[in-house]
């Protein structure tokens, strides 16, 4: 198996090394693991691509490259440049430093990479490590992802539910904010929504008196509805959320089609 690994935290992020180790387990001795990751921090860029400017790509080692672009750019670079003669069978994005559960998923560059892979009909999984008081000061805050990552990916590959249409399924996996020994298991869960925890802006002044706005995030320890992703994470479970690149709301479409007749 040939695996392309990317992230949104950048080429030097600790979570990328975690995912490289996981990918090597999945690929096996006869497989290949290639890394194409952003040269700098790209958190919060979602599924953006850099079609208005060229991207610089740098070779770090035989199968490791950095790209001056977004996570989705890195996927494109991996598919159509770095691995163009031997395209990947699987794309893994992460392991993100922080959760991408609930409405956080809508901003995530980690998930943006998985979306891009799915558009090109390649199986794609986004993985993120929830951080909180019970794991952030651990020697290895990514311990849960390190320990269970390969197991979760192998299950998803075994079950083989990726869809067959033009718009296909990818997976959003979030590891709970606890150490590996405290993980209670895994649960399939839909996206939750954090009430009163969305992004806002915080005004500030520079020393020269110029006005700036900082994006400000809300607390991450607010549980979502029962059995949704962030809620199961905060209760010690790994959440697995199937997601689709088709953004159509078919329920509303059906109702409106009857009204527009």
Predicted regions and their residues:
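A cross-family phosphate/adenosyl-ligand binding-site feature
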Residues: 3, 17-80, 85-87
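Glycine/threonine-rich flexible loop motifs
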Residues: 99-108
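Active-site glycine-rich loop that binds ribose-phosphate moieties when present
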Residues: 108-114, 141-159
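Short acidic, Gly/Ser-rich segments with clustered Asp/Glu that frequently serve as metal-coordination loops
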Residues: 9-17, 206-208
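C-terminal accessory domains and tails appended to enzymatic cores
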Residues: 157-166, 170-261
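Glycine-rich phosphate/pyrophosphate-binding loops
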Residues: 118-141
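Alpha-helix C-terminal capping segments
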Residues: 28, 80-85, 112-123
